[in-house]
């Protein structure tokens, strides 16, 4: 669907089709146009106007069809679609308009009122030809790429992401990601982060049930309260995985996955700020 037809859609249908609001889409177009104006030699005129290029890239993330099928809809070759996707992604990333606050922001949160939630989500990938064991996730039962999310509990803002191969344990991914918290910042994580209190004292994880025993009523209440606070991260995961490129089997080169997930997370934060 080209931009002329997309303009005829209602705001609700446009977001359902693309995964972003019309206001966010227009801002992305403005960012790309500003970058294009900087070029002294624009070169050959592209077949698609900038609005169509951005819409095509968003649809690629949203539907995650092959370049071939996307090209059939837009009247482009596979290579032209690939070049356009890479170009628009690189412009949006380099503009820093959709950058995440980053790990340093966690050290600037001294108050216990700033509660953060940490969790890991997985995206399936095609079975690798080499090093299959490194990507196989026992929890998911398939080959995956892991993404660690650190989220502000009250605002639902994504602060930073970390990435790893499917086999790596959630807690080990945390240690290798370089994420550090200020001493007074309270952190909530799931059972995969058992032992985090040794690194950060103000961390809380659910109480694991002892082998052959049951949890006491107070322990169950404690776990229930933690789950109530950390449910926000599940809602954020759902919002991100509206884009099939993060939820369906990832077919592209793995080194591009981190860039794309950070960009989509930044777009999510931008939309969140619009609602505030």
From Swiss-Prot:
Q: Which UniProt keywords apply?
A: DNA recombination, DNA-binding, Metal-binding, Transposable element, Transposition
Per UniProt, a divalent metal cation binds at 119, 170, 190, 234
Q: This protein's superkingdom?
A: Bacteria
The molecular function terms in GO held by this entry are: DNA binding; metal ion binding
Give the InterPro entries listed for this entry.
Answer: HARBI1_dom, Transpos_IS5, Transposase_HTH_dom
GO BP terms, alphabetized: DNA recombination; transposition
For the DDE Tnp4 domain, which residue ranges apply?
A: 118-256
List the cofactors: a divalent metal cation
Family named by the database record: Belongs to the transposase 11 family.
Role noted for this protein: Involved in the transposition of the insertion sequence.
| PANTHER family cross-referenced by the UniProt entry | THAP DOMAIN PROTEIN
UniProt name for this protein: Probable transposase for insertion sequence element IS702
Which organism is the protein's source? Microchaete diplosiphon
Q: What is the lineage of its organism?
A: Bacteria, Bacillati, Cyanobacteriota, Cyanophyceae, Nostocales
């Amino acid at each position: 669907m080209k931009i002329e037809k997309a303009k005829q859609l209602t705001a609700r249908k446009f977001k359902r089709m693309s995964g972003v609001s019309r206001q966010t889409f227009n801002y992305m177009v403005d960012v790309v146009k500003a970058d294009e104006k900087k070029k002294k030699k624009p070169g050959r005129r592209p077949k698609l106007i900038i609005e169509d290029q951005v819409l095509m890239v968003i649809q690629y993330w949203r539907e995650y069809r092959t370049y071939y099928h996307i090209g059939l809809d837009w009247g482009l070759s596979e290579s032209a679609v690939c070049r356009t996707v890479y170009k628009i992604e690189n412009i949006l990333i380099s503009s820093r308009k959709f950058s995440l606050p980053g790990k340093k922001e966690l050290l600037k949160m001294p108050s216990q009122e700033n509660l953060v939630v940490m969790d890991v989500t997985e995206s399936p990938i095609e079975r690798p030809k080499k090093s299959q064991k490194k990507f196989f996730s026992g929890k998911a039962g398939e080959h995956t790429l892991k993404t660690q999310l650190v989220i502000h509990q009250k605002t639902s803002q994504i602060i930073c992401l970390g990435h790893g191969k499917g086999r790596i344990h959630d807690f080990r991914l945390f240690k290798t990601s370089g994420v550090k918290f200020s001493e007074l910042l309270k952190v909530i994580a799931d059972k995969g982060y058992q032992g985090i209190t040794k690194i950060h004292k103000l961390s809380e994880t659910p109480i694991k049930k002892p082998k052959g025993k049951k949890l006491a009523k107070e322990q169950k209440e404690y776990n229930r309260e933690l789950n109530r606070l950390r449910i926000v991260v599940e809602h954020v995961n759902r919002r991100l995985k509206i884009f099939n490129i993060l939820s369906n089997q990832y077919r592209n080169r793995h080194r591009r996955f981190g860039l794309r997930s950070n960009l989509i997370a930044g777009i999510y934060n931008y939309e969140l700020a619009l609602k505030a």
